[in-house]
Design a protein with these regions (language model features):
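Extended hydrophobic leader/signal-anchor segments used for secretion and membrane insertion
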Residues: 1-96
Length: 96
């Protein structure tokens, strides 16, 4: 079984790292260590069946603060909107 997962970028929250329409290869998350600056795919904390791609910018007591790379405030729905997320929301990871 492959540990590789592909996700399509929708929107510009991760610009300039990823652009709308990019297909990005991630490693399936198997509860290995997450570090600041890793890019993750996770389940949205409040929207059912909705995944988001974000960068981990802070880790506090095994919870993650995630942000989009696009610095325009309105471009990203992230931890600024919903706070820290639990690692059980993480689906896949891309190391930097």
């Amino acid at each position: 079984m492959s540990n590789t997962l592909y996700f399509d970028v929708k929107g510009n929250s991760m610009f300039p790292t990823f652009k709308d329409g990019d297909s990005i290869c991630f490693e399936k998350f198997n509860h290995h260590r997450i570090e600041v600056n890793d890019i993750i795919v996770c389940k949205h904390p409040f929207k059912t069946d909705f995944n988001i791609i974000k960068r981990v910018t802070k880790i506090k007591e095994k919870k993650l603060f995630i942000e989009g790379d696009n610095k325009e405030i309105s471009s990203s729905e992230d931890s600024h909107n919903f706070g820290y997320i639990n690692t059980n929301k993480v689906i896949a990871i891309k190391r930097n």
